[in-house]
Amino acid sequence: MNAPPDFRRAASHALWLALALTFACPLPGLADEHPDARRQAQLRHLLLQDCGSCHGLRLTGGLGPALTPEALRGKPRESLVATVLMGRPQTPMPPWAGLLSEDDAGWLVDRLIEGEIAP
């Protein structure tokens, strides 16, 4: 039994749209760019000063939870990046999307997970 021509046309269009979107949208992690050295210094300062004001000057916790590698272990990177960018509603955690790009937030999260930012 053959499908009606309208169904085949719609299915064909849906397939082409899916393929186009697959190649037009970068895969997570492939488009990430590391900030340049100047921006990295700014991000380190922001992390230690602004984030540290709630997460503790040593990032071991305070008003907000600890941001140590041990505390972040097992948490999905994408979830941590989303928290940085979007904040946490009903908590003191503000959204930083107005000041940070997704690459900036990803770079910060990666540094925290690896323990590469120490006060």
Curated annotation (Swiss-Prot):
Q: Where does heme c bind?
A: 51, 54-55
Extract the PROSITE patterns matched here.
CYTC (PS51007)
Could you say which residues form the signal peptide?
1-20
GO MF annotation: an example:
electron transfer activity
Keywords attached to this entry: Electron transport, Heme, Iron, Metal-binding, Periplasm, Signal, Transport
Would you tell me the Gene Ontology cellular component terms?
A: periplasmic space
Would the keyword Iron be found if you checked this record's keyword annotation?
yes
Chief site of localization: periplasm
Location within or outside the cell: Periplasm
Gene3D superfamilies from the UniProt entry: Cytochrome c-like domain (1.10.760.10)
What modifications does the entry list under PTM / processing?
Binds 1 heme c group covalently per subunit.
Q: What does this protein do?
A: Monoheme c-type cytochrome.
Q: What is this protein called?
A: Cytochrome c55X
User: What gene is this protein translated from?
Assistant: nirC
